[in-house]
Amino acid sequence: MSFLQEVGKRRTFAIISHPDAGKTTITEKVLLFGNAIQKAGTVKGRGSNQHAKSDWMEMEKERGISVTTSVMQFPFNDCLVNLLDTPGHEDFSEDTYRTLTAVDSCLMVIDAAKGVEDRTRKLMEVTRLRDTPIVTFMNKLDREVRDPMEVLDEVESELGMACAPISWPIGCGKEFKGVYHIHRDETILYESGHGHEIQEVRTIKGLDNPELDAAVGSDLAESVREELELVMGACPEFDHELFLAGELTPVYFGTALGNFGVDHMLEGLTDWAPAPQTRQANERDVVATEDKFSGFVFKIQANMDPKHRDRIAFMRIVSGTYTQGMKMNHVRTGKNVSISDAVTFMAGDRSRAETAYAGDIIGLHNHGTIQIGDTFTQGESLKFSGIPNFAPELFRRIRLKDPLKQKQLLKGLVQLSEEGAVQVFRPLQNNDLIVGAVGVLQFDVVVARLKAEYNVEAIYEGVSVATARWVDCTDGKKMDEFQRKNQANLALDGGDNLTYIAPTMVNLNLASERFPDVQFRATREH
């Protein structure tokens, strides 16, 4: 297969949803259809150790949440799909955010009983920055749900996207009978109890087919016909151009737990979602089909293999081809490196990559030299833009139970901060270590991982910090004066960038008024 064909069949997407909307379950079912897993792992029988395939750090298994972003690749419909699973839990917004910079489209999963929820709103704001195309799956139709029309209106008004239904539900909860596929003009009937296998489904052609009345009852059949007449009148038809511009989303209905409707959504995704896209670098725009290799690191994860203390840097290939043993230029350090052992992923199972193309995600073994946002090329000096770091909103001071382990603690914290699990600040005037996070759960994760991976027992104490800002100034003299007068509030972050640690928001506002030439930034590009 030619290089252009290889790139053209790639589809790289992430799933976004509010916690508990069913994202991990959908991931399972998607992989089941991609033949990657024979029996979906969400079915945790008594005493069975078959946990969901994409939730694989110990803590995730205990809490039933996906904390780290996994990457899974599988074939479907003549395409090769790269699925990036993102943490659904409240606290992992930074990791999730960065993952969204590495995809070409997104699948939005909505709990049809609840509609648009807070976390979905936040993540959608991120996708709007790059006008990422969105496919929508309305989940949990096998439970009692809200009026589907009402939920579509909510998506339109709250997320600013027009909705074009591709399928429409017939009943819900115990009365859920299946969906009518608008594009195919056929009804697909639902049978419960087939959640963990691909089932043979019965289809009925045409809306006016008397078989439909026999299958679902004439009252329900009649009300669906009336509903669909309204839907066809009120909702726009699917328009591919508007979809690619991020202005319209195709909507599918189903139940991930019952494994129903997921395949229709996958077909839509592979048919319509874009192949790898052109990306902006500071120097120029890079087209996916260029010959020369380029890629950027959007995430670093420590110790994917508990037996080896290694770290893996996840890289999105932007253009060209990766081949085993090729030389590439690590732009930030200026060094040429030869990469012979990159890996591809199937959540938790790693295999060595022989070749990979634009759109693929590969893992590089990282011995402390790679950071988030790093660019690798075949010699050209490029820096891909738009991979931000956020100022944390919560802070704790971290203390050791055994004071002799200060060195291991610092090493562990710096490594964890490089992979974006947490941010660490070292005040200039004392030996404290302050840890900053976007959500509370990150603190628990850090203590658990320090113990498991670095054999360091640490505890937290409260600290009077309201927020942190990265500071810089083009005028060297003014910067020196600012540093002299604010020594007590300055710290270095994990990457040795100067940071202003504000005890209160009032303090921050006063400091920025007193030093108008100094810039206080709430985000920093990696």
Curated annotation (Swiss-Prot):
Its annotated compartments are: Cytoplasm
The answer to whether keyword Cytoplasm applies is yes
Give the main localization category.
Answer: cytoplasm
Q: Extract the CDD domains matched here.
A: RF3 (cd04169), RF3_II (cd03689), RF3_III (cd16259)
List positions binding GTP. Answer: 17-24, 85-89, 139-142
Domain tr-type G: start-end pairs: 8-277
Which keywords are on file for this protein? Cytoplasm, GTP-binding, Nucleotide-binding, Protein biosynthesis
Q: Does Protein biosynthesis count among this protein's keywords?
A: yes
Concerning InterPro entries, the annotation shows: EF-G-like_DII, EFG_III/V, G_TR_CS, P-loop_NTPase, PrfC, RF3_C, RF3_dom_3_sf, RF3_GTP-bd
Q: Which GO terms describe its cellular component?
A: cytosol
Q: Which domain of life is it from?
A: Bacteria
Q: Which GO terms describe its biological process?
A: regulation of translational termination
Which molecular-function annotation in GO is an example for this chain?
A: GTPase activity
**What SUPFAM superfamilies does its record include?**
EF-G C-terminal domain-like, P-loop containing nucleoside triphosphate hydrolases, Translation proteins
Job description of the protein: Increases the formation of ribosomal termination complexes and stimulates activities of RF-1 and RF-2. It binds guanine nucleotides and has strong preference for UGA stop codons. It may interact directly with the ribosome. The stimulation of RF-1 and RF-2 is significantly reduced by GTP and GDP, but not by GMP.
Protein family according to the UniProt entry: Belongs to the TRAFAC class translation factor GTPase superfamily. Classic translation factor GTPase family. PrfC subfamily.
Among HAMAP family, the record links this protein to: Rel_fac_3 (MF_00072)
- The protein in question is named Peptide chain release factor 3
Q: Which organism is it from?
A: Aliivibrio fischeri (strain MJ11)
